[in-house]
Amino acid sequence: MSRVVLLDAGPLGMVSNPRSNSEAEECKTWLASLVLNGLEVVIPEIADYEVRRELLRANRDKGLARLNGLKAMLGYAPITTAAMLKAAEFWAVARNSGRPSADDAALDADVILAAQAAVLAQGETQPVIATTNVRHLGILADARDWRDVR
């Protein structure tokens, strides 16, 4: 079974930001080490959307160029119908159990990302989500703080 790391918007935003603080530099080094060690790292479409919309809003052309470069270098996981059907199921279960991860009217990126991981897990893949938001994602998927993914 192959292992794949899905980048959530938090780490993806840090590695695509050309203006770095110490945490972002640490995240860039972490990502490079994953790639050098042969781990498959994938950018989920929903994480790309979350980071891209903010870069576009802020007119961050260098950040967009870096995001596009990462997208070309790493794997990319498009949102599929199967993932959206699973996301709807996750959304309903989370709300019915009193543990929503977003406002009822919001597009819940966390459940979409967790659903993408669940769909990947149905095959020969063992996905782990590298995130800054383990609390919400960890309810629905194998989600770990990005520093803990190796």
Where do the language-model regions lie?
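Short, flexible/disordered intra-domain loops and linkers
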Residues: 17-23, 99-106
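Acidic catalytic patch
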Residues: 73-102
